[in-house]
Amino acid sequence: MSLIERLEGELREAMRARDDDRRDALRLLLSSLRGAEKELQRPLHDDEELQVLQRERKRRIEAAEAFRAGGRAEQADAEEAELRVLAEFMPEQLDEEELEEIVDSAIAEVGATSMRDFGRVMADVMPQVSGRADGSVVSQLVREKLA
């Protein structure tokens, strides 16, 4: 079952349950995925679907932070509610320990000793953590390890 089919099923359930917040969040996700399909003029692959979800996740986080900074807690809460719905369809995020293990093994594998090797380490780590860790968190961890 594709992600779009799962989202459509969840949307039907949310409509039956009259869960307006969940329904709206699912509609936004479906709209983003369908927009990406139309842009590419073909069905999305799993990794492309994941990229769309990650992009939407990042947008929700940034919007919630901006609303909080602007003193608009109600809109920030709405964005965070959408983020919780979106998280249900994303792969489980790596915890700090697992991410550190992956980074440490990549540093050892590449033979990195300084910040000059940052790009090579990131190139080794990112395919392993794709969709399961935020790139900025990975980047920060690699910088700390190489410093």
Predicted stretch roles:
Residues M1-A147:
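Charged, compositionally biased, marginally structured helical/coil segments
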